[in-house]
Amino acid sequence: MLCLPVFIILLLLASTAASNPLETRIQSDLIRAALEDADMKTERGFLGVLMKGLKYLGKVVPIGSLVKDLLSSSDE
């Protein structure tokens, strides 16, 4: 007779936990997608800043002469 209430309680606990894995899977997918978006935004932002810096550097010092100087110094 004592087994019946325990069985009912376990059945209730199991039924409430059944919907949880789907929710956590969806939540983890959403979190992963958000992190990938944030990572891509960071890369685009970093590359944009890097390209702007190189463009500015190209205006100050011509990139061709800078590369030529670097290549000639590595030959020595």
Swiss-Prot record:
The keyword Secreted applies. It is found in: Secreted. Residues 20-52 form a propeptide. GO terms for cellular component: extracellular region. One of its GO terms (molecular function) is toxin activity. It holds the Pfam family Chi-conotoxin. Keywords: Neurotoxin, Secreted, Signal, Toxin. Residues 1-19 form the signal peptide. The keyword Protease does not apply. Expressed by the venom duct. The mature peptide does not contain cysteine residue. Belongs to the conotoxin T superfamily. This is Conotoxin ArMLCL-022. It comes from Conus arenatus (Sand-dusted cone).
